[in-house]
Amino acid sequence: QDPQRQLAEMARSKSAAAKKAALVGQGDLFAPADPAPAAAAPVADDEEVDETDALPAEPEMESAQTTPHDYRIVRTADELRAMIAEIRRYPEFCFDTETTRFDLFNDRIVGMSFAVVPHEAWYVPCDERSTPEYAGLLRPLFEDETIAKIGQNIKFDLMVLRRIGLAVRGPKYDTMILHYLLDPESRHNMNALAAKYLNYKPIEIETLIGRGPRQLTMDLVGVERVAQYAAPDAAVTLRFKRALL
């Protein structure tokens, strides 16, 4: 066979094989195409992802309604004597006063609350008849210099007690001043301290006396309702002192 013809046939054979190989690599053009991977859904430019879903939920604040407690109303002189005897077993006690309004020079005391352990407190209602007798029974306790006294904005309470003839002696702790010394830039009222240190929401005084021109005076509110407000204040203030020192 002519050598040139043989070379031509070999060339044509290689060309056909190459084309076949190329077609095999491409696959069948008429076969169903493999499904393409699903594309991610586009996010609109103005659509924001809520990152707070991944954050832990804020703990619900405690309150007098949700926290186990023992708040008692002292209604007689004998019950007051028993309360005083119990308080004397402790090295310190917290106290708070309630007045008709917030005018030190014209208001009248309505009651006092006392606490020596967290979540427990007494409320002692005071009227014009009982105040002199109760003040006489409480005088040795307030004048005892071996027992520390605790209050929130205690200067107000000291002045209220002075008006009914009670002098307060011994060590005194004011949680408002304590917090000012630790964190002078923050707020120091009871609601702020309760939220910050105890995750607790005190009862608002407006829930008892209202607000505005029709606001009541505290002596017009029932003793039970005042006790629900005043007793927790003493117990919470005691917890402030132990959290701050």
Residue spans for each PLM region:
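Long, highly charged low-complexity segments
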Residues: 1-107, 112, 127-141
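Active-site-proximal helix-loop-helix substrate-binding element of RNase H-like nuclease domains
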Residues: 58, 62-71, 103, 107-245
